[in-house]
Amino acid sequence: MQTMKTKVAIIGSGPAGLLLGQLLYKAGIEHVIVEQRSADYVASRIRAGILEQVSVDLLEQAGVDQNLKEKGLPHSGIEILTNGQKFRVDLSALTQGKQVTVYGQTEVTKDLMQAREQAGLCSFYESNDVQIHDFYNAPKVTFESNGTHYQIECDFIAGCDGYHGVCRASVPQDKIKTFEKVYPFGWLGVLADVPPVADELIYVQSERGFALCSMRSETRSRYYIQVPLTDHVENWSDDQFWEELKNRLDPESCEKLVTGPSIEKSIAPLRSFVTEPMRFGKLFLAGDAAHIVPPTGAKGLNLAASDIAYLSSALIEFYTQGSEQGIDQYSEKCLQRVWKAERFSWWMTHLLHRFETESEFDHKIKQAELSYILGSTAGQTTLAENYVGLPYEIKSLDYLKHAS
């Protein structure tokens, strides 16, 4: 067995692990990334596409925002379609100029992987039998890669390996508490190389169920419709999908909708999930390893980024100043923001979807609530503040700015 030593072992090379690695690299902190999947698989995963303002700022501080600046699509508002009428929520006007940016998680991942490769940083892909050990005292990571067995001795382990990863599963059950809500429907999503139906996202509340008109670029669109959990992708031809989407849109949007062959089609179940705490001795959980949100609020990737903002700040503070304050506060600070994002994502999901179990009274109440929100500046402000992203509880991210 080959033994290595480093300061931080990062398990998982999704956006959370890669972003943490990039920020640690900028601060001169040694680290290694261990990933079970291949680099090609990681780079090709199709995920979220909306970045909060604070996530964009964090990628800039990490020095990986060149493509984001060139190809990202800033959006200052969203549209909500209900009862056949569209209402625009002016995000920027309601949040002192803040906005969101359309830039796919796939592109964020590729940018971070390219920066890592150019810097010649150590990553192990296609790692087998990844295990973490003794993370309350002397952390170690063991795995096999290309026929060689490795042991990494480190100061800390960052568990960025997703919902099904080994890190959370390695925590003793009496040390961890989980909270979960599974929703009784999924999203059937289609990716197509057609221009978007509108310049901004359209969220649809309809009698036939939720729909979302989104995009990845000016020439690639992403559309979703609510379907039962029992449904299967094989049940939907492209023509059937487009027809059902039109049934949920207003006449103007139907007229503008450009259809075409799908290049990806899948059904994603919706769930809310939170782990408490997010730190176990010298093991930190971040991103999907610690929490899942339904995609309605566009918070999954952004929560991973905020976790990494707190974690990188804490580690930089520890290695540059010898302070453990950030480490000790990591879980508490993250969870404050996580639960607010969970609330917003749950609220958006509940407000815009049809539940089979809801009564006509429940349905009328939801319509009244949405009508109130859209007709009230205060209501729209609440939605907008959460949508563009709540601020980080870090003093201007001073440590990260210094690291960059």
From Swiss-Prot:
Superkingdom of the source species: Bacteria
State the pathway, as annotated in the record.
Aromatic compound metabolism; benzoate degradation via hydroxylation; 3,4-dihydroxybenzoate from benzoate: step 2/2
SUPFAM superfamilies, alphabetized: FAD-linked reductases, C-terminal domain, FAD/NAD(P)-binding domain
TM spans, by residue? Answer: none
Question: What keywords are assigned to this protein?
Answer: Aromatic hydrocarbons catabolism, FAD, Flavoprotein, Monooxygenase, NADP, Oxidoreductase
Q: Could you say which residues bind FAD here? A: E35, R45, I46, R47, A48, G49, I50, Q105, D288, L301, N302
- What assembly does the database describe for this protein? Homodimer.
Tell me, in a sentence or two, what this protein's role is: Catalyzes the incorporation of an atom of dioxygen into p-hydroxybenzoate (p-OHB) to form 3,4-dihydroxybenzoate (3,4DOHB). The reaction occurs in two parts: reduction of the flavin adenine dinucleotide (FAD) in the enzyme by reduced nicotinamide adenine dinucleotide phosphate (NADPH) in response to binding p-hydroxybenzoate to the enzyme and oxidation of reduced FAD with oxygen to form a hydroperoxide, which then oxygenates p-hydroxybenzoate.
Q: What is this protein called?
A: p-hydroxybenzoate hydroxylase
Spell out the NCBIfam families in the cross-references.
Answer: pbenz_hydroxyl, PRK08243.1
Q: Reaction catalysed by this chain?
A: 4-hydroxybenzoate + NADPH + O2 + H(+) = 3,4-dihydroxybenzoate + NADP(+) + H2O
In which organism is this protein found? Acinetobacter baylyi (strain ATCC 33305 / BD413 / ADP1)
Q: Which InterPro entries match?
A: FAD-bd (IPR002938), FAD/NAD-bd_sf (IPR036188), HB_mOase (IPR012733), RIFMO-like (IPR050641)
Biological processes per GO annotation: benzoate catabolic process via hydroxylation
